[in-house]
């Protein structure tokens, strides 16, 4: 509908897609479909004529029908091939980003929207989370690596209790906001990954189980979009609000050397994901984007962690995002803020891929809009908590909001 805008989106998002080729292929598919329809119409007409034709004419019609069958077979094969190519290109077609997105090739072009809270000042030399956790016997990296290889870990004792507390806090926060709690499958089929946009672009990031034609999902979002694939929802059921809880798995291909120490970048983690399906209205989607972002900020403020909200650039947000805000939380050992949350608005990009639709008040069937944001992901947030709230005795002060989940304990 707007090829120039799509070309601009392809350019600023760094997508490897020739829009002119896509348009040519679309015209070719439409033309081939017309040819198929016309050939089928001639075939039906020939069949009707055959019943009332004389013997000589029937012989002619048999020959014509045989020729038509050959033509139809060739046309259908051409149409199938062209349609498959077109679908492949359509899967690469990006959402046009919102006008406020910084234009740039990657996260180096991201801009800080606001900084909330103040990083702690220590009157002693603080430990990084690996040193502290190993000193307290709260993590075992070496034995975990024997079992599962690099970036494996085993949370132990009070650290596991802290993880449970953080997730309970996040889930209770979302219950209060009328989100439906869902424990989703982590084993998913390929169409679910295509529907959310993980495939084909990020196939290398995904663990595969070829024997069963299954994959390990990197986020609950995959299952939550898939729940409503090929459905038509009633407008009265919108917005759909889910708090998806699941183990998540990511290969982290190409991340060697980037914050890989300890618990910061691992292959398996637990996450509570906020997910919304709303009506196809940009203003409503924007309101939900602000709501999801605000909930994540509320959680971090409750925990007492300093953070920054970042406006993600066109090159960082990925093909499907209309808008993306990361939240980066202060990590004392790095002397920097690191990503703990990512809030995304995708308009109808996922809904079109997955077939998530709704019937509007006037009876019109439309593709819905989808949004998502992390509520909390562990173990990365645990690294932030133990580093920010450590004492000189290598204890950890428990944020007040978590104390009810830990039997009232103020120190770990």
Predicted regions and their residues:
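N-terminal alpha-helical targeting/anchoring segments
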Residues: 1-120, 138
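TRNA-recognition modules of translation machinery and tRNA-sensing kinases, especially anticodon-binding
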Residues: 115-412
